[in-house]
Amino acid sequence: MAASGGQKSEKLDEAQALARSCAGRPDFLPCDGLSICATHSHGKCFKLHWCCHLGWCHCKYVYQPMTSVCQLPSTAVPVAPSGHTHTMNLSISLAERFLRTAPKFQAPPCPESPKFCVISDLFVDDYMVKRINGKMCYVQRPPPPTPNPTHQPQTAAPQPVPQRSKNSHQVGPTVKQGQAKEKISAPKMDHCSSPSSSEDSGINALGLHYMESCDEDSCVDDDDEEEEDDELSTDGNSSPGSFWDQDECTLLSPSKSIVEIIEKIETTV
């Protein structure tokens, strides 16, 4: 309690000292109790103002009141523009320009209707299911000759594709070379078709027939596979050369393709 009383007495003494110092100034003005006290001290931009502090009047620096706008020097604004002026009314000028150029405005052209592709044209769907060494494989059929080719790019030169026989797991095999070499051209590629270079499609990256899409591990001679070959080879249209005689067939999907069997062209000793 004694400490708090001592602090109050110190503040009171300070306020009295400020009041005495301010009262002796020649510009002393009594405090009206309504002015806001300020603690700024920015030199000539401020004037002295008397305020109350702990019941005693003392002086403080406050902001100098702003000069009224009416008292500031100003340039006389003419009532009407003179004849020699370089100004213009932008709104009127833009409106007149728009009215002059409005008849020349044209609506944007209507965009062309989108061209749709048939979903079946996006896939090379001329495959045949063939049985090679006991394994069913997809082999692409050579494209039929078109009488009037349209939008056909320049095709590559025809390349002969010899058929190689599987000669694994044999000591002295004698391979039959009865199958003739056939020259085929690359398939037709237009804007709707997409070339396939994967091994699953049965063609290589050049669009030729992929004759080695089957694994060589599946060429093991089993009695069951020989019996199936004998049963399936009873069909009259199962000769090795019958595959090349079907150039006039239409394009078929793998679900509607022709099942053809290639008999083993290897002999065992």
Curated annotation (Swiss-Prot):
Skewed-composition ranges (Acidic residues) = 215-233
Traits of the deletion mutant: Double knockout of c3orf70a and c3orf70b resulted in significantly decreased expression of the mature neuron markers elavl3 and eno2 and the midbrain/hindbrain marker irx3b. Neurobehaviors related to circadian rhythm and altered light-dark conditions were significantly impaired.
Q: Where is the composition biased (Basic and acidic residues)?
A: 179-191
Mind listing the GO biological process terms from this record? circadian behavior; nervous system development
List all Pro residues biased stretches.
Answer: 141-150
Q: Does the keyword Glycoprotein apply?
A: no
**Record keywords, A-Z:** Neurogenesis
| Pfam families reported for this sequence | UPF0524
According to the UniProt entry, which residue ranges have a biased composition of type Low complexity? 151-164
Task: Note down the stretches annotated as region Disordered.
Answer: 139-203, 215-249
Role description: Plays a role in neuronal and neurobehavioral development. Required for normal expression of neuronal markers elavl3 and eno2 and neurobehaviors related to circadian rhythm and changes in light-dark conditions.
Question: Can you tell me which family this protein belongs to?
Answer: Belongs to the UPF0524 family.
The entry's protein name is UPF0524 protein C3orf70 homolog A
The record lists the organism as Danio rerio
Protein's gene: c3orf70a
